[in-house]
Amino acid sequence: MTWIPLHCHSQYSILDATCSIKKFVAKAVEYHIPALALTDHGNLFGAVDFYKTCKQNAIKPIIGCELYVAPSSRFDKKKERKSQVANHLILLCKDEEGYRNLCLLSSLAYTEGFYYFPRIDRELLKQHSKGLICLSACLSGSIAQAALESEEALEKDLLWYQDLFQEDFFSEVQLHKSSEEKIALFEEEWLRQNYYQFIEKQLKVKDAVLTVSKRLGISSVATNDIHYLDPDDWLAHEILLNVQSREPIRTAKQNTYVPNPKRKTYPSREFYFKSPQEMAELFADHPETISNTLIVADRCNLELDFVTKHYPIYVPEDLQKKGSYSEEERYNASSAFLEQLCEQGLKTKYTPELLGHIAQKFPEKDPLTVVKERLSLESTIIISKGMCDYLLIVWDIINWAKDHGIPVGPGRGSGAGSVMLFLLGITEIEPIRFDLFFERFINPERLSYPDIDIDICMIGREKVINYAIERHGKENVAQIITFGTMKAKMAIKDVGRTLDTPLSKVNLIAKKIPDLNATIASALESDPDLRQLYIDDAEAAEIIDMAKKLEGSIRNTGVHAAGVIICGDPLTNHIPICVPKDSSMISTQYSMKPVESVGMLKVDFLGLKTLTSIHVATKAIYKKTGILLQAATLPLNDRNTFSLLHQGKTMGIFQMESRGMQELAKNLRPDAFEEIIAIGALYRPGPMDMIPSFINRKHGKENIEYDHPLMEPILKETFGIMVYQEQVMQIAGSLAKYSLGEGDVLRRAMGKKDHEQMVKEREKFCSRASANGIDPSIATTIFDKMEKFASYGFNKSHAAAYGLITYTTAYLKANYPKEWLAALLTCDYDDIEKVGKLIQEAHSMNIPVLPPDINESGQDFEATQEGIRFSLGAVKGVGVSIVDSIVEEREKNGPYRSLQDFVQRSDFKKVTKKQLESLVDAGSFNCFEPNKDLAIAILNDLYDTFSREKKEAATGVLTFFSLNSMTKDPVKVTISPENIVRRSDKELLKREKELLGVYLTAHPMDAVKHLLPFLSVVQSKDFEGLPHGSVVRTVFLIDKVTTKISSVEHKKFALLQVSDEEDSYELPIWSDMYAEYQDLLEEDRLIYAILTIDRRSDSLRLSCRWMRDLSSVNDTVITECDEVYDRLKNQKIYSSTKKSTGGQSQAMVKKEEPKAIPPVTISLDLNRLRHSHLFTLKGLIRKYSGSRALSLVFTKDNQRIASISPDSDFFVTEDISAFLQEIETTDIPARILATAV
């Protein structure tokens, strides 16, 4: 007999069910069940995913929900016990009307009825019952509760629901009975008693409900309230229940009859996905309860609509004034308004200078005609696809932001390829000039809508979203929900804690998980020690087994960082919504992909801090010079800008701050904006391997070759190297006569590695190329290169738009360095490490950073004639409101004249003594009293005097002090400087660093400057000029110590952030050194050390070979240092690995005859691999080049995607420990496989 599960929970019943949608549906397939319901607690989070997965497996999906029903009104939120605030009820969708009603009920449960749970009430049920089938739910349902109370109460409840839902109401019966053998396995007696009481209730409810339902003509169905898949999943489920409460479920107790009130547990262990046969046996005395589930399934025929768009519409103002209009009239008016905006843009955007650039591209045509032809093409496609409203809505939002002084980025993604978007001001980079294609944005040969993402100043982002809400209606706009899942490490820790396992053992297992995104299965596969632990230790094996079951479970909800949904009518007409914790804005119940698939418009409002920095800087520049700088109108050939990049001074330049980018800028020496675009596209996995060739070709050190002459005009800009996806489209068009739309289809197929489509495209390309007179073998070669490249090629439109931001930041730094660095410091003053680096950058540019001053500093860092003035707001412990109060008073009544004047004019409700002391120690009152200890004593005395006086004045008591204040006469300070306990310079300097995050007015090394010549010290500023293999003595201050454990050797090592007066740098202390010197590794300690210089990679790397506390240095220590120094100088510390390649290092170094030793194998996770990771790894391989073969394995979602075998060009040193240790210090998503050791 077939049975349909109608009461089922997935992991979207958060922390209450372990079933993933995929495994849940697979179980139904295994049991040959034709239909399946999903009824998660109070939400529809998983509905779309469930629906699609069922359809893919030829199973009828039944979308439902186990709702919480308030016992009285949903608005009644009295402080009752959690168990008494709601009853359960199952609703299942029959059709589209039922789906809309269920969406609305689930939404209102959150927006109106939330109290412990999202709750509806009977009033809402009456209003929205159409199209729904109702089941009476479990023991927590009101009908089950009535059955336990009396037959009269039961009959009354059944009749109420029967009257409302008619034949679509079914009473529900459940029985979670276990065998005596299973009951005997319960660990504690109270659990057994709990089970017996539960079964007694279930039997009583079952009998009563079946009896009364039969008398009333109500059909009954049997369900099993599924919360996990298999019988042995009960323990994993119980662990999940207790994750949030952090309550151990295993504790040693003397009396097993006493329940643990904190432990969450289900009374039976039968809440698994039972087979139809098991259910038929369980309800053999009432077989109709099984067959009735088929009747329910037969009535549920909901088909979700994935075609219709529910996008908002745009109504021009002229039409709004008219009042009534047809949809055709509205759309025509919108199209006309769009064309009008474009006409205005043609007049204002296309300056003679810009038209001159286009004329260079098309010398035989009038440039304005070129623009208008492109616009006509775009307009035709946009209007035919019904996209006018979409573009106007985005234009309206961006236009409002700009009108209100909120900076918006120059574009993002493929939208920068559209002339229309440029004319509308949605983007700020002209696409024809830079060979950007509209077809990359909207392909006329595809139906899908494009995304237009908006970069917005961080500060103004919330205002822009609020405008969208106000413009389109609060009920039409929502954030997008996200789901936080249990990663492997977290699952192991949660399971270990819940099973009350010793923390040491839990940590031992967790540390075997190499990174945040590794799975337990992959860790077991790659780590032999973990496998052995699993085999040898039963307790560890149980933790691992349970964690594997819970890995990937949803742990919490959040909201998407950028995505906002805008609908043309109330969202609840189409999707369910909820209210996120600590948010006033509603959120969708569907995550990003599902919500877009059901026709919702997603707009990404991405907060970009760089735009805020640009805004702050340009405001300061305008205030100082009267010049209003805008990214769109900057000269793109500024000599200062390119000179700055040639020097590699990329700190504070958008997308170019990493060490790898710094080296790339220095080596490439870009001298055109197009090369800045290329830099952003090259520094990524794939094309990164071509960086040396790109550099050499630019500088004439490598020949530029083309597979066919037709490719030269396409690839000339990038020196014969494919860098952009658009170049694939161009090559297909030039060689094989593809339209740009067809070229985009080809690009997508290549990128997705769609084998079936690629077979067709290869034949099409080669055939058309042959017809165009191209040799078939050449065509095949070119197609192969295109196919290899397209999987990692970059979107040129995006690279160009972001390249403009890069150029703008470089321009500001090169031409207005004080204003730019002040803006960066203002926007990053919460990041102490970043502030320190920026101040060092200012010093390297000979720009003094001045301490805060009570009369000159404000909320922001400010560029002054002398340098950059430190912000009062950046002083630790001094809040925004205090600084605002200080500045407001200063602007209103003039500068503060003295300590007394400052205190007298202070708002005592906002300023505290502790904050005054912080301001003093930061240097803010040096203008009045440079002795900080004396200044604090005076301020405290004045503070007590004036705060007392103000209190007395408020009570109407007139004293000498209040008279004194009223006449502004000086208060006599009785503090004698001789009686003040003065702190040492070292203490004051340490306090300054605590408050400012940096040593600003001095450095601890100042005190030992006189010693440095006698210690033969080399300072950090001189490291860059030293050759490979140099040995240096140096002195540094330890700023930060980060201790780590190697996943290979499981030994401690440290990463030090150290500094001297000139610079800061990172210094690794490997495990052998760490064991010897760990007692010295303390912050704020001055160290005398010997370092070695390694230049085998693209950047300078340092290793520490010896160290001592500087305070302990004496003749003996100096002698010891000299001996170590001489020994290292006479050793060949590093082997030279450079080959002559026209002055450039080879990408990889190949040894001709590697020794027969096992290869090192490294697995790289493509889900998290970034271009910077490969660049760093490449440098490490060069650094540790040797004779031992290295294999790279690339994985995605734990599946092996590709590999580079040991017979490739990758070789490292035989002793790989240092190589592996250095990988540990990076964030490369790498795992060292078993063959590595």
Swiss-Prot record:
CC per GO annotation: cytoplasm
Enzyme class: transferase
Disulfide pairings: none
GO MF, any single term: DNA-directed DNA polymerase activity
Chief localisation class: cytoplasm
An individual GO BP term: DNA replication
Entry-linked NCBIfam families: polc, PRK05673.1
Protein name: DNA polymerase III subunit alpha
